[in-house]
Amino acid sequence: MYEVIQKRKTKIINVLQSPELMRLIEDPSNLGISLHFPVSSLLKSNKCTPMPKLSTYSLASGGFKDWCADIPLDVPPEIDIIDFYWDVILCMESQFILDYNVPSKNKGNNQKSVAKLLKNKLVNDMKTTLKRLIYNENTKQYKNNNSHDGYNWRKLGSQYFILYLPLFTQELIWCKLNENYFHVVLPSLLNSRNVHDNHSTYINKDWLLALLELTSNLNQNFKFEYMKLRLYILRDDLINNGLDLLKNLNWVGGKLIKNEDREVLLNSTDLATDSISHLLGDENFVILEFEC
């Protein structure tokens, strides 16, 4: 599965290496870059597929840091933007695949099979998601339709994000907005050669402030009654580098969230027709929640 996703990730990086984006990345005043798109961009009814939107995190004129300039990214015409969007969605949702549930015998073929199962599930789930979003838009329910399952990482997002946040890491960060919950999966720092002191990276809260600011901006755009940021941090990373973050969690307005009960899931009748959900889980992560 890793090799399959890595190929998709490489394709994404190739698209992101546009002159426009590289200029923003190389500008030292930009402390973060966000690229995002609504899943409604996948609708075949669109006469022209919308381009992803680009925002930068930098020091504003008032002396504070903020996300600004939500403008379309200029993507070369030879790029299949729909394929790009699906690659991003697959990379985000694959973060929850539990490797040990993939049989070791003929693992290469099994990984391809899992990737195909996941993609098929995403396509089917996306049909349901798009129908719901269209209904909410037509009935204007989106204005105060705070979903009861927006917290559920198993639900597809209404928007997907790629973050480049050198305050934390040089790796891409995968995110999605699901109703009034912003889900952010942090990459591992344990094997990063670009971070000299992983421990101090977690202690330095500038990266967390950037994510909170981005979540707050989303809240202003969608006018939800409340907006929450959910961070998914790999357990090994947190144990080795991030315990100080846990110690100071109350000071930064965060709280620990329980992982899902897999016993309930595994005994669910829904799995009778779903051949991939049992391979997904959040138990590799420590989940932190912040209200914005």
Swiss-Prot record:
Where does the sequence pass through the membrane? Answer: none
An example Gene Ontology CC term for this record: cytoplasm
Q: Which Gene Ontology MF annotations are present?
A: ornithine decarboxylase inhibitor activity
Question: Which GO biological process annotations does it have?
Answer: negative regulation of translational frameshifting; regulation of proteasomal protein catabolic process; viral translational frameshifting
Q: What does this protein do?
A: Ornithine decarboxylase (ODC) antizyme protein that negatively regulates ODC activity and intracellular polyamine biosynthesis in response to increased intracellular polyamine levels. Binds to ODC/SPE1 monomers, inhibiting the assembly of the functional ODC homodimer, and targets the monomers for ubiquitin-independent proteolytic destruction by the 26S proteasome.
Give the UniProt family note: Belongs to the ODC antizyme family.
Q: How does it assemble?
A: Interacts with ODC/SPE1 and thereby sterically blocks ODC homodimerization.
Put simply, this protein is called: Ornithine decarboxylase antizyme
Name the source organism: Saccharomyces cerevisiae (strain ATCC 204508 / S288c)
Taxonomic lineage: Eukaryota, Fungi, Dikarya, Ascomycota, Saccharomycotina
